[in-house]
């Protein structure tokens, strides 16, 4: 889908991702009904946007995770730990209604790459 925003932006040595969701390359939500699958795709998208800004997961300072149902926290957390296995970033996780009813998780990240 096309929305009026940038998937990522850079400034002051920082890389900001917009909220990433479980869209695949065709713009379709993947893993409908499966928070683990959606978390994997969402984080894959985060990593891709970070790379476009010159950052890696090792540069991430902070993530914000939005869950359609906070009861999915543990499942999301298990997938998150696979991407950030050591020295994970600061993180806030909240329950929120997401843009489309099939979306279960959204993640945004801030990374530092220097000036």
Predicted regions and their residues:
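Short, polar/acidic, helix-capping and beta-turn segments at strand->helix junctions
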Residues: 1-115
């Amino acid at each position: 889908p096309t929305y009026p925003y940038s998937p990522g932006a850079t400034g002051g040595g920082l890389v900001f991702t917009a909220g990433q969701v479980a869209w695949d390359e065709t713009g379709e939500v993947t893993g409908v009904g499966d928070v683990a699958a959606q978390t994997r795709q969402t984080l894959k998208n985060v990593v891709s946007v970070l790379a476009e800004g010159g950052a890696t997961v090792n540069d991430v300072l902070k993530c914000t995770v939005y869950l359609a149902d906070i009861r999915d926290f543990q499942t999301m957390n298990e997938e998150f730990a696979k991407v950030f296995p050591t020295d994970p970033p600061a993180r806030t996780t909240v329950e929120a209604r997401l843009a489309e009813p099939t979306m279960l998780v959204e993640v945004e990240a801030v990374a530092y790459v220097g000036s």
